[in-house]
């Protein structure tokens, strides 16, 4: 959107604070229904960030897929679960939780140091042909496809790995 500078900056700060507060709500709230609503707030804020950066197609896809489908599915799953099982065990930290948090923290630190120390400009993931001129493309969806397969190949693959890990975690939780 073409907004004046102060309004654009205010919206960025407002959406950023909504994103941070919503993500803290997802992690820190003990009631899973409230956590799911906080996740919906986070996803809506991300969609509004896309609107501010003139990516209307991605914003609509974000709203339809994540907020409209996945977050509602999470809410239904949480509401159909027995709520009393969340409050039976008051022991917050076990040995397994401590080991898991230590392993996850070490993986996070190693990933952050690797990402920050890598010179990403020297890595050529795919060859971009010179015949593709972005101004001649018909719509935003073609530009998104080209950027996902060339410029944003690494983040796209990292997101697919994160989704795969989340799917495996959901299966493990469902088996318990």
From Swiss-Prot:
It is an enzyme of class 7 (translocase). InterPro entries: NAD(P)H-Q_Oxidoreduct_6, NADH_UbQ/plastoQ_OxRdtase_su6, Nuo/plastoQ_OxRdtase_6_NuoJ. Its main location: plastid. It comes from the Eukaryota. GO terms for molecular function: NADH dehydrogenase (ubiquinone) activity; quinone binding. One of its GO terms (cellular component) is chloroplast thylakoid membrane. Keywords: Chloroplast, Membrane, NAD, NADP, Plastid, Plastoquinone, Quinone, Thylakoid, Translocase, Transmembrane, Transmembrane helix, Transport. It is a multi-pass membrane protein. NDH is composed of at least 16 different subunits, 5 of which are encoded in the nucleus. Belongs to the complex I subunit 6 family. This is NAD(P)H-quinone oxidoreductase subunit 6, chloroplastic.
